[in-house]
Amino acid sequence: MARIAGVNIPTNKRVVIALTYIYGIGISLANKICESCNIDHNIRVVNLSDDEIIRIRNFIRENYVVEGDLRKEVSMNIKFLTDIGCYRGLRHRRGLPVRGQRTHTNAKTRKGRSRLPVAAKKK
């Protein structure tokens, strides 16, 4: 298995698909990485040479924030919003939708299960 950005990427998949296993890299970014490193999109990870893997690894390290650093950056941004007490921070703190979606009928996933007491069974 090739190890890129601290992630073991699957060897039997195409390079573009395998790169998406890294947090912070999607399909379009994986395509850009392959183009920049002059690697064919359809080649499998098994068929990559060590030189090509090192080129991909170095390109990602130099140009993108991925995995743990990206997770930390996102959580710090959310923490900053909650600390300054802005509206978006309050919505994060309360576990409600942040970007203006309606909550009267929707947002069940974001709000979580309702904490209503179960009615007692009649005898």
Curated annotation (Swiss-Prot):
Keywords: Ribonucleoprotein, Ribosomal protein, RNA-binding, rRNA-binding, tRNA-binding
Gene Ontology MF terms: rRNA binding; structural constituent of ribosome; tRNA binding
Matching InterPro entries: Rbsml_uS13_C, Ribosomal_uS13, Ribosomal_uS13-like_H2TH, Ribosomal_uS13_bac-type, Ribosomal_uS13_CS
Assigned GO CC terms: cytosol; small ribosomal subunit
GO biological process, one term: translation
Pfam families: Ribosomal_S13
Domain of life according to the entry: Bacteria
Region described as Disordered: 97-123
Annotated family: Belongs to the universal ribosomal protein uS13 family.
HAMAP family membership: Ribosomal_uS13
Subunit structure: Part of the 30S ribosomal subunit. Forms a loose heterodimer with protein S19. Forms two bridges to the 50S subunit in the 70S ribosome.
Described function: Located at the top of the head of the 30S subunit, it contacts several helices of the 16S rRNA. In the 70S ribosome it contacts the 23S rRNA (bridge B1a) and protein L5 of the 50S subunit (bridge B1b), connecting the 2 subunits; these bridges are implicated in subunit movement. Contacts the tRNAs in the A and P-sites.
Protein name stated in the entry: Small ribosomal subunit protein uS13
Species for this entry: Ehrlichia ruminantium (strain Gardel)
Gene that encodes the chain: rpsM
